[in-house]
Amino acid sequence: MGKIKKRATSGNAKNFITRTQAIKKLQVSLADFRRLCIFKGIYPREPRNKKKANKGSTAPVTFYYAKDIHYLLHEPVLDKFRQHKTFAKKLQRALGKGEISSAAKLDANRPKYTLNHIIKERYPTFLDALRDLDDPLNMLFLFSNMPAIDKVSTKIIADAEKLCNYWLAYVSKERLLKKMFVSIKGVYYQATIKGQEVRWLIPYKFPTNIPTDVDFRIMLTFLEFYSTLLNFVLYKLYNESGLIYPPHIDIAKLKAAGGLSSYVLQSKDGKNVAILQKKQDDAGSNVEGKELSSAELKKAIKADKDQKDQDTIEDAEEVTEPTVEETELDEFQNGTTNNAVDTLVQPSQFSSPTSQLFSKFIFFIGREVPLDILEFVILSCGGKVISEISLDDLKLNDPKLYASLDLNSITHQISDRKKILQKVPGRTYIQPQWVFDSINKGELVSVGDYAPGETLPPHLSPWGDAGGYDPNAKAQVTAEAEEEEEEEEEDEEEEEEEEEIEVADGDEDQDDEEEEEIEDEDLKAQKELEMEVAGKKFSELQNAEEGSKQKKQKKNASTKAALTPEEEAKELAKIMMTNKQKKLYKKMQYGIEKKTNRVDELTKKRKQLEKKKKQLKDV
C-alpha cells in the first residue's frame, strides 16, 4: 500500500498563500509589503476553491501566489527596507540620548534604494514601456494639479509638474499629437509614438477639494514607480531625437507667463531646437537638389562616353560570326543643356496631416482662453502662439521692445467672448473649439460655424462608436425627415379615402353579416344533432377544428417569415453554442438592440426639432 497523502500539501493549499503568511515569511510590515507588491507588480489572486486554499477555513482572507512571494525573498529593495528599519531604531535611540551629531551622521548615511532594476525587469523592451504609459501619465498629471497638503508635499507636486512639462514639450516638438477631446473631467489627448498610441487625461486647473477617505500612501507609492518609469522613457526619447535631457528651464519666462515656452529644448550640439526646427521646415517646403559645377558635369559625361566605347569594343571581340547585325544604341541626352539640376526629394519629418495643420498660421490667444491647452495643441500642429498675457508682461517690463513689435503677421485670434468691439483687419476671429475639431478631423474645418457669438456644433469624442448617433450628419437627417414627412402625408390621405369608402359601404355590409350569422347558427345546430346520433361530443369536434386552424396559422407564419441564408447560418451557429456562449450572445444582442434604440430615439428627436425649426421659418 502507498503512503497516505497528507492534507494541504498539494493543489490550492500549496499554490496559494495568505497575506498574513506572506508578511511573516518576508519579515516586513504591512505597509512595506504593499509597497513591495506595487513595485514588483504582484497583486492578489482568487483561487477556485477558497476553502481548500485556506486549509478548510472559510474566513475572508487575501490570497497571493506562493511563487510570487518566494520570488520577493531575493528582492534588493526588501533588503533596503530591513536596513531602513534598523536605521530608524538607531536614529530614535540617538535622538533619545540627545546625541545630535551622531543622529546627523546617521541621517546623512540613511539607506536609499532605486527602482531602476525593477523597471528593466517589468519592461524588457522600450515598446512595453510605451504601451503601459497611460496610467503613469494620468497619475502624474493628477498630482501636478493638486494643492499641497500634509500628506503630499510641495516637492512631490513640483517634481510631477516638471515631468509632465518635459513630456508635453517633447510631444509638441516632435508634433506627435493626433486626437483630443474636451470633456467634463478634463482634456483627453492621444499621441502616436513609435507606432504605439498613448492616451492621457489632463485635469482642469480648478480649486479641488481633496477627499479624506483616499489612502495617499498607496497613491504616493504608485507615483514613485511611475515617476521612475517616465524618467526612463523621456531619457530614451530625448536621446533618440538628439536632445539634452532634462531640458533647460528659462526662469524668467517661467515666472512671467510660464507654459511650454519656458522649457528650452537644446540639441546635443548645443544649438537651440527652435532654430533647427525652422531650418527643417524651410527645407521641407522648398526642396532643392545639389547643384553640380560645369567641371564636374564634363568629367561625368567624359567618363560615361569612355565607358560606352569600352563596352562596344568588348562586344565586338566576343562576336565570332562574319556577319554582324548592326543595332542602334539609345542616345542619352544631357540634361544640363536645358539648365536642369539633379534633385533628390527628401522625406518630410512630419508625415501625418495634423503635424503641419497650423504651420502657416500665427495665433493670438486672449486672456479669457486657457493658454496651457491651446499652446500645447497649436505647437503640436506646427503653429505659432502669441498670448495676450505675455504681451501685457512685456508692456510693463520692456515698453521699448513692446513698441517695436509687429503684430500684422497674426492670422487668427482665438476669443471666447460673445462680441468683439474692435476687430483688427486681416485676422480671422474664432472660438477655441475650431482648433480642437480641426485636429480631430485632420483638416481645417469651416470658420463660419466657429465665429465669436455663434452657436457651436457639437464637440464629439474622436474615440466614439462608429455606429452610434452622429449629430453632425445634419444634411442627411434633414433629407430623410423631408422624405418621411411626404410619405406620412400620403399615408394620411390614403387612410382618409379608405375611411370614407368604409363609411359608405358600412350599411350594405351590416345586412350581409346578419344573414351570415343566421346561417352559421343553423349549421352549428345541425352538426350537434349529427354528433348526438353518432354518439360523440360536439366539444371534441370544436377542439379539433381549432387545432387545425392553429396549424394552418403556424404554416402561414413560417412561409411568410422565410429565413435568409445569413439568418439560417446564425440559427445553426446558435444551436452549436454552449450555454455560456448563448448567455454571452444574448447579452451582446441586448446591448446592440439598446444602442440602436437609443440612436433611433435621438434621430427621431432630431427630426422633430428640424421640423419645428422649418415651421418657424415658414411663419
Curated annotation (Swiss-Prot):
Report any one BP term from Gene Ontology.
maturation of LSU-rRNA from tricistronic rRNA transcript (SSU-rRNA, 5.8S rRNA, LSU-rRNA)
Region entry Disordered, spans: 303-324, 456-567
UniProt keywords (A-Z) are:
Coiled coil, Nucleus, Ribosome biogenesis, rRNA processing
Keyword field contains Phosphoprotein: no
Q: Where is the composition biased (Acidic residues)?
A: 312-324, 480-522
Subcellular localization(s) per the UniProt record: Nucleus, Nucleolus; Nucleus, Nucleoplasm
SMART domains given in the database record: BRCT
Domain BRCT, by residue range, is 353-452
As recorded in UniProt, coiled-coil segments are: 472-560, 588-619
- GO terms for CC? nucleoplasm; PeBoW complex; preribosome, large subunit precursor
Q: Name one GO molecular function term.
A: ribonucleoprotein complex binding
One of its Pfam families is BRCT_2
List the InterPro entries: BRCT_dom, BRCT_dom_sf, PES
- Regions of biased composition (Basic and acidic residues) lie at 523-539
Q: Which PROSITE patterns match?
A: BRCT
Major place of residence: nucleus
Asked if the keyword RNA-binding belongs to this entry, the reply reads no
| Subunit composition and interactions | Component of the NOP7 complex, composed of ERB1, NOP7 and YTM1. The complex is held together by ERB1, which interacts with NOP7 via its N-terminal domain and with YTM1 via a high-affinity interaction between the seven-bladed beta-propeller domains of the 2 proteins. The NOP7 complex associates with the 66S pre-ribosome.
Question: Which HAMAP family does the record cross-reference, listed alphabetically?
Answer: Pescadillo
Query: What biological function has been recorded for the protein in this entry?
Result: Component of the NOP7 complex, which is required for maturation of the 25S and 5.8S ribosomal RNAs and formation of the 60S ribosome.
Sequence similarity: Belongs to the pescadillo family.
Q: What is this protein called?
A: Pescadillo homolog
Q: What is the lineage of its organism?
A: Eukaryota, Fungi, Dikarya, Ascomycota, Saccharomycotina
Q: Which gene encodes it?
A: NOP7
